[in-house]
């Protein structure tokens, strides 16, 4: 039965879990599809994936795809298509979901290892269930190290060795440079290239490093601009606005400058909000906003009809005022 993958486009955990599927099953790169957590991004990916599957009976692995409640019907469409055609669906994830959605999705899948997991990311779950203890690859030592790197990256833990830390940065910056292209064949090809490099037993390539370095320079420049005009929400949060920053670094820069508990970076290009916290559970706020993630790192979509843009100080203040109200209800209500 042919293997397909639908995974998270925006970080190395999504790409890493797909790379392990390629190692385990020899899955063709053309069978790997990517999505973010937006309705538009998911609809694009489901359409492309469905066209590729056609009427075949296949096994679909869905990895690192946190379930935002409002997207469940879209996910169900592809799951039901695969099942109707005699295929199987396996879902590996580690994000915070509502219990009701966990039960709904688990009942539809053949295998579902889902819900909050503070120990293992999606790449680790994939490795532990499909590769660990099996001589599937001559690169087992490499795979163990790669999975460790992904764990450090996804749980925001800094490795001791500088080269490992730099590799995490290379992944983050190169992936971000590709996803700024938006859902497209060009984006997907570049992300598949990263997966091919990893599946072949290499951590990176000259092109990945070069693309990451270019985006890093841009990211640093835009971050400096963002930090000149931050918005404070009580004694708990600061908000910054900028197009297409790497979210962890954007929030980290806000935290470093303000020493706040919750840093909120608003991607003005994608209309998404990104949260990082030292203390508070950010999923309480992100889920209220229609998003999700991890306790100390999460995100949410922004309604384009209600907030059409953030080009002016007035439009940003309007959104910050809205956020302040949601924070009040979430943490002090």
Predicted regions and their residues:
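Short alpha-helices
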Residues: 101-183, 187
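Short, structured active-site "lid" loops
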Residues: 46-78, 83
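A short helix->loop->beta-strand "cap" motif at the edges of active sites that frequently abuts
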Residues: 83-89
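Gly/His-enriched, cation/cofactor- and phosphate-binding structural elements
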Residues: 2, 55-57, 84, 206-333
């Amino acid at each position: 039965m042919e293997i397909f993958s639908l995974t998270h486009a925006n970080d190395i955990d999504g790409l890493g879990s797909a790379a392990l599927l390629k190692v385990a099953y020899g899955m063709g790169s053309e069978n790997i599809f990517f999505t973010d957590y937006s309705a538009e991004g998911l609809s694009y990916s489901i359409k492309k994936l469905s066209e590729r599957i056609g009427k075949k009976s296949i096994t679909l692995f869905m990895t690192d795809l946190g379930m935002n409640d409002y997207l469940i019907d879209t996910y169900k469409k592809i799951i039901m298509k695969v099942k109707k055609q005699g295929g199987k669906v396996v879902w590996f994830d580690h994000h915070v979901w509502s219990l009701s959605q966990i039960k709904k999705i688990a009942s539809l899948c053949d295998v579902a290892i889902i819900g909050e997991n503070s120990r293992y990311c999606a790449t680790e779950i994939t490795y532990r269930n499909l590769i660990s203890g099996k001589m599937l690859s001559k690169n087992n030592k490499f795979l163990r190290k790669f999975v460790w790197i992904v764990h450090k990256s996804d749980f925001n833990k800094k490795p001791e060795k500088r080269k490992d830390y730099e590799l995490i940065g290379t992944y983050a910056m190169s992936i971000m440079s590709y996803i700024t292209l938006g859902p497209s064949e060009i984006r997907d090809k570049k992300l598949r290239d990263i997966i091919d490099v990893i599946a072949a037993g290499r951590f990176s390539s000259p092109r990945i490093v070069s693309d990451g370095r270019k985006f890093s320079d841009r990211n640093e420049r835009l971050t400096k601009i963002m930090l000149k005009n931050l918005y404070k929400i009580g004694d708990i949060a600061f908000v910054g606005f900028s197009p297409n920053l790497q979210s962890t670094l954007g929030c980290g820069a806000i935290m470093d400058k303000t020493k706040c508990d919750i840093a909120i970076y608003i991607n003005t290009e994608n209309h998404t909000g990104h949260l990082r916290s030292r203390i508070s559970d950010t999923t309480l706020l992100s889920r209220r906003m229609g998003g999700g993630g991890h306790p100390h790192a999460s995100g949410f979509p922004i309604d384009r009809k209600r907030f059409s843009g953030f080009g002016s100080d007035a439009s940003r203040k309007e959104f910050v005022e809205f956020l302040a109200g949601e924070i009040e209800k979430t943490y002090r209500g």
